[in-house]
Amino acid sequence: MSVVSNHHSNGNGNSTVYDTNGNDEIKKEVKDEPMASDSEVPFGELMKRDKKEKKQKKRKAESGSDEDDYKPEKRKSSAKNGKKKDVGSDSEDDYKPEKKKSKKNNKKKAQESSEDDDEESEGDVSEEDVKPQIHSDDELEEEDEAPTTDDEEEQKRKEKERRKKEKREKKERKEKKRLEKENRKIKEEDDEDSDDEDDEKAKKKKRKSKGAEKSKPSTSKKDAGGKKEPPKKKVKKEEDIEDIWEWWKEEKKPAGVKWNSLQHCGPLFAPPYIPLPSHVHFKYGGEKMKLTLETEEIAQFYAGVLDHEYSTKEAFNKNFMKDWRKVMTVEERERIHDLKKCDFRAIDAYQKEQREIRKAMTKEEKLKIKEEKEAEVKIYGIAIIDGHRQKVANFRIEPPGVFRGRGGHPKMGLIKKRIMPEDVIINCGKDTEIPKPPPGHKWKEVRHDNTVTWLCSWTESVLGQNKYIMLNPSSKIKGEKDFEKYETARRLKKKIGGIRERYTDDFKSKEMRVRQRATALYFIDKLALRAGNEKDVDEAADTVGCCSLRVEHIKLFDSAKLNEDDKKEKEFVVEFDFLGKDSIRYFNRVSVEKRVYKNLKIFMEGKAPSDDLFDRLDTATLNDHLRSLMDGLTVKVFRTYNASITLQEQLIKLTNPKDNVAAKILSYNRANRQVAILCNHQRAVSKGFDESMQKLEQKIKDKKKEVKEAEAALKSARGAEKEKAQKKYDRLKEQLKKLKISRTDKDENKQIALGTSKLNYIDPRITVAWCKKFEVPLEKVFTKTHREKFRWAIDMTNSSDEEYVF
């Protein structure tokens, strides 16, 4: 690169040499000759100098009045235009306002501009070549601030540390969320009821959608001022919208009045029967036989149970054949009379094929079905009660099919007939529009009864029971009923001492009726037995309660062990063994008071095993007596009271405030388990239990390995790495502890249904108060269904400063 010595003087006797390409590299400094005086300068040149000085003064004045108006000038680069500029030129075109950047850049550019403008050639000094250096206010401020560089560095350092701290905290929060998510997954594997499973599906779906949103690039825009636009509010789907009705803060309606206005769209009937395709045949005696649609539909019902044990039961087959023949034509009845000659295999194969087709549906096909169901919910799933939108619980009428029953139900195999509009009674407000029946049909009856809570009613064909369409458990009507139930149980707590004294005195009554009532009430109080209703064993399953116990259901032992593991025997032992509600076996050995034991011996004397134990007592008589002791008291209130008080006492006994959340939840589940055992809320061990436990054991094994590796890494770590290794080790130890707790919880509750007592018998305010006191998230113990149903309890408990005590 050639260097031409071009000297621009700054008027102070020094000049700097630059290369002609505009590079800033300083080559050398030379001493300037003194500037020529006015007398030596020609008059024309002097006029030009004066003119230039006036311009400079004007610039200074403008710069002083508004610092933002003036910006350091920059020499035009001749290279830009592709032509060389005369070095000595003083043309105004050689100046171009410099774009304002940072203060540092302003200072640097100002210096460069000053040096460029003050270059002077080695020859005669020309006035046009003199360009005085002008400093803007910004530049002066920069010069003043120059000594404070250390403060700026310190400020930057602090800012850097702050950002690091924020990043570290963010990372810790993320790790905490990850741990919570992992714990949630472990907990989710142990969901004990269908409500938990439904809720979990919703959670997974929500997490999946959130993950999809995170994977998308951010589309947020900023306005001119650099501020982010406010996020758009998420609009709820119409079907998700239900009025949050704080009915517990309103005045109560007159006694017996459930609603003032009620509007709904009636029930949704089962879809019509779709005939079998022409290539699928029913065979009788090895020959193909064409059936009428009514007969063919019922044949499909039986084909659906071919692989089930029901098809091997004599009672089931006998009842099915009897009901099936009722719908057959005369010709069909003459030919079909032996179920063993009926061949349903082709129909069964077709049904299995259809199931596989449904499983293999595309995403779009499944979405279409989902949208159709959502559309049905919008129409039939909402009722308007007193101006508030409330969910309807079961708006779909059950389709026809075969009655299976629980246990050895005597009516298993009978046909559940198709319900038609002509079978249905509608209940709605007088001033509201009556639901329209399907075209060509009419309702059996339309009522306007505001003393009942059902929307529709009909009688089913097998058991002759009334079926109802009701509002969702989260509705006001259901909530009021629950609130009254638990308040009655709380009132019982204040009177239970006197009631117990009363029935204890009645153990010795001279009247056998009073003795039986007192003894039965003792079992209802101590064992939380159901009352039991009289049933015709030929019409219903042989399930019993306290009042309907038979001699064959109990055994007496003067002394015996209550459990196989017990070392000592107890006196006056009674063994109960019978089928309770839903044909669930109740087996229990208890030690009773001596007077109760003697009474049972008296009640059993001279009776056959099939005779009633309490032959002078029934449920109605017992409930009448209870109402005389306390207003609103029934056998069910005793059950609710004992369930609630047991949970509260167990929570006080088991909860350790120093435990982590997982350990506290284990304590809660153990307390809940005692309630479930008391109420005999059992369930069958799930088919996938063993597989699930194996997976959990493998997780524990893998986690132990991780803990061991982390421990080794901690021992070898030094300096800053040691703190990081310690955190990792502690985190893994905590995860292992939670997995072990989950294993214990899962194993203990494999045959116990915790959800039933939580949903129907335990005062929810006990649980809410416990969560509040021990800082346990309510979602850990209450599913979405629980939280919606007990919205009133959550609000009442959390809004009160006092701790709730049952």
UniProtKB/Swiss-Prot annotation:
UniProt keywords, alphabetically: Chromosome, DNA-binding, Isomerase, Nucleus, Topoisomerase
GO cellular component: chromosome; nucleolus; nucleus; spindle pole centrosome
Acidic residues biased stretches: 113-127, 138-153, 189-199
Domain Topo IB-type catalytic: 474-803
CDD domains noted in UniProt: Topo_IB_C, Topoisomer_IB_N_htopoI_like
Region of interest (Disordered), residue spans: 1-236
Compositionally biased intervals (Low complexity): 1-15
Free-text disruption phenotype from the record: RNAi-mediated knockdown causes abnormal gonad morphology, enlarged sperm nuclei and aberrant progression through meiosis. Oocytes appear to have undergone endomitotic reduplication.
Bias kind Basic and acidic residues: ranges: 24-34, 128-137, 177-188, 210-229
Site keyed Interaction with DNA: positions: 358, 406, 454, 485, 543, 581, 623, 681, 699
Principal subcellular localisation of the protein: nucleus
Subcellular location: Nucleus; Nucleus, Nucleolus; Chromosome
Bias kind Basic residues: ranges: 49-60, 98-108, 159-176
BP GO annotations: chromosome segregation; DNA replication; DNA topological change
EC id: 5.6.2.1
Primary role: Releases the supercoiling and torsional tension of DNA introduced during the DNA replication and transcription by transiently cleaving and rejoining one strand of the DNA duplex. Introduces a single-strand break via transesterification at a target site in duplex DNA. The scissile phosphodiester is attacked by the catalytic tyrosine of the enzyme, resulting in the formation of a DNA-(3'-phosphotyrosyl)-enzyme intermediate and the expulsion of a 5'-OH DNA strand. The free DNA strand then rotates around the intact phosphodiester bond on the opposing strand, thus removing DNA supercoils.
Other noteworthy facts: Eukaryotic topoisomerase I and II can relax both negative and positive supercoils, whereas prokaryotic enzymes relax only negative supercoils.
Protein name, UniProt field: DNA topoisomerase 1
Organism, scientific name: Caenorhabditis elegans
